[in-house]
Amino acid sequence: TTNYYELARNSLIKNLELSNDFVILPSGYGTTAAIKHFQELLGLYIPPATKKRFSFKIDKKTAPLVIVGPYEHHSNEVSFREALCEVQRINLDKQGLVDLNHLKEVLEKNKHREIIASFTIASNVTGIITPYEEISKILRSYSAIVCFDAAASSPYMNIPTHLYDAMFMSPHKLLGGPASCGLLIIRKSLVDTSIAPTFAGGGTVLYVNKTSQTYQNDIETRETAGTPPILQFIRASLAYQLR
């Protein structure tokens, strides 16, 4: 079983043309779970009940700024509104596309802040392709973390890894993909292995005694708590192989 699971991972790396700087993390059932996993890794996600219990207040001046596009799926915008960050939506231009001038204005105004940008590659509604190469180039010039929602685009195209730092995918949108798992593609340098994993479950630990624990250093291992989605991950791999 482990062998088939790792073969699936290697197949995904090949078919998605991923560099050695990235890892693939199976996440829930689709892009929504992949975005949540990303937010957890970057310290942005916080459960609403925790907010209520401890009365969290965000200082807009010091919180990360998350920039999103004008036609994002709810998961790629509303979820960030509830996270520990400030959200800025980029306007549409006169042609109904991403207003790149507005993007530059927002970046210049906030260049002193930590900036995370998350744009869809293709609209779930219209299929319009976002100018992701130009957007990435602009964001890189401001040292922003670049994220792409590839839910609607990955059945048809790959995105070169130098253009992004994290990508969210829903293999269930591919032929043969239903019942697969969501995928988070993330640059290894964004994952802090000096702290506990996002969930300290079975399989994430290296050693445990009565009072302390040491966690695995391998990112894929420490970020797949409990029983891994073996069949779902293999199905995702086969779907991209068929593509």
Language-model features: locations:
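Pyridoxal 5′-phosphate
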Residues: 1-243
